[in-house]
Amino acid sequence: MSFIERLAPLRTQPGTRLTTGLDDATLTALADRHPQLVAAVDAAAAEFARVQGELGPLLAQDEQAQIEAMQDGFVNFYADDAVTPYVALAARGPWVVTLKGAVLYDAGGYGMLGFGHTPDAVLEAMSRPQVMANIMTPSLSQQRFI
């Protein structure tokens, strides 16, 4: 099964999509040179299989309704037109796969520090005990970072 075919369970869900992502021909052309793209699709397929029973009827909803359901109860201080028009399901490096199966290239915003989504080095560092302090509290981890 090709990595594109692994997106079928996500893409065959009913509901209007807001985000289409990159077309399959482009994704196929990029796959050999971007292993994180394939890893993102694999992660999305696995995560979808894991949450499918839990999300149930939400999967059939329009993408806008899914967005609203995910953010229900949160205060989002961004303007409505600045909220991304999808629910992110999984990501690796700069590649994001939406709940509706769109694949996007996201080079990141604040907080990613150039590492992308789900960076192995950051996850490994976070798996060890860390002093939870900001810049006002000098710590060994600050020096290690530089």
Predicted regions and their residues:
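Short secondary-structure capping/junction motifs at helix and strand boundaries
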Residues: A133-I135
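Generic structural signal for well-ordered beta-strand positions
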Residues: L104-Y105
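A structural motif shared across PLP-dependent enzymes of the aminotransferase-like
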Residues: Y86-W95, M112-S127, T137-I146
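Acidic surface patches and DE-rich sequence motifs
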Residues: T98
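Active-site-adjacent loop/helix segments that line or gate small-molecule/cofactor pockets in enzymes
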Residues: S2-R92, G109, P129-V131, S141
